[in-house]
């Protein structure tokens, strides 16, 4: 899952993006939002900067189709809620993609 795609330490390259390999992209986490360019970010970005044209809105405008995930950060707290009709790997994965 592309993780904080809009900061300069982990930038998501939409030219190389393939939804077959990464059908989910992180839209929000404790550091801030990657929904659109210049979204509000946590004031302590660990020395990182936000990079334009790497937001999820930018990817959607380019025609990509992907699901969103959001969660906390580090130490196992990055939890995503899923509504699935079947409690199987295929059912859960199908619900988020």
Please state what every model-predicted region is.
Residues 1-97:
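Extended, charged catalytic domains and RNA/DNA-binding interfaces, predominantly
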């Amino acid at each position: 899952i592309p993780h904080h795609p809009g900061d300069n330490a982990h930038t998501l390259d939409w030219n190389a993006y393939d939804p077959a390999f990464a059908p989910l992209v992180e839209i929000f986490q404790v550091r801030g939002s990657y929904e659109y360019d210049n979204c509000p970010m946590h004031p302590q970005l660990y020395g990182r900067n936000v990079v334009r044209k790497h937001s999820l809105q930018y990817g959607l405008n380019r025609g990509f189709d992907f699901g969103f995930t959001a969660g906390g950060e580090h130490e196992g707290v990055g939890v995503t809620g899923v509504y699935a009709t079947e409690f199987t790997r295929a059912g859960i994965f199908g619900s988020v993609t």
